Design a protein with these regions (language model features):
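Conserved S-adenosyl-L-methionine
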Residues: 13-18, 125
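Rossmann-like NAD(P)(H) cofactor-binding subdomain of soluble oxidoreductases
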Residues: 74-142
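Conserved N-terminal Rossmann-fold NAD(P) cofactor-binding segment
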Residues: 16-58
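General beta-strand structural signal in soluble alpha/beta enzymes
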Residues: 47, 63, 105-106, 127-130, ...
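Rossmann-like NAD(P)-binding element
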Residues: 40-102
């Protein structure tokens, strides 16, 4: 996915790694070639469709391996298929790289796919995270617009659940210009 590709490019730009293995059940060679053409010095980029090759002795995994949402689908519609993908991911981690340091899940619904990956991988909760800050960032942006302030003065915005009608907002933690949101919205 482009989100994963962006994360990989940032890692290379920051010098966090010189070895990168791209794995996909469909050939990731096109993405690998695009990254090679970015001209990062001293970087080894491998592309493979073989999970054993990709995961054996991996130290960090960033997975965007879920199916994308199609027109008319809700995020909840993605749940079954993407949780099956997350289950297999967890099993593959347990088999090929049980000593992985950290896994980041960036496919939806991230809260559940992250949990499923965690349960099947045998890893500790501190070793599996999701990139799910989008909703909190959107909340922060909307509050800033609503109150006519900069996003810099909107703090501690937290949400829970997938970004849909079931999502909850923690109004008790959010602050706008240091004032509790709960007191501002009545």
């Amino acid at each position: 996915s482009s989100a994963a590709s962006d994360v990989y490019k940032r890692q290379l730009m920051m010098g966090l790694t010189s070895n990168l293995c791209l794995y996909d059940v469909f050939s990731p060679e096109g993405v690998a070639e695009e990254m090679r053409q970015c001209g990062f010095d001293g970087v080894n980029i491998t592309a493979t469709t073989d999970v054993k090759e990709a995961f054996t002795d991996a130290k960090y995994i960033i997975s965007s391996g879920g199916a994308p949402r199609k027109a008319g689908m809700t995020r909840e519609d993605l749940l079954k298929g993407n949780c099956e993908i997350a289950e297999q991911l967890g099993k593959d981690i347990k088999t090929y790289c049980p000593d992985v340091k950290h896994v980041v899940i960036i496919f939806n619904p991230a809260d559940l796919t992250g949990l499923v990956t965690l349960l099947y991988s045998g890893l500790k909760p501190s070793q599996v995270t999701t990139l799910a800050a989008l909703d909190s960032t959107r909340l922060r942006s909307e509050l800033a617009k609503h109150f006519g302030v900069s996003m810099d003065v909107v703090e501690n915005c937290r949400t829970y659940g997938g970004h849909g009608e079931q999502m909850a907002v923690y109004a008790s933690t959010a602050k706008v210009e240091g004032k509790p949101l709960a007191g501002m919205i009545g």
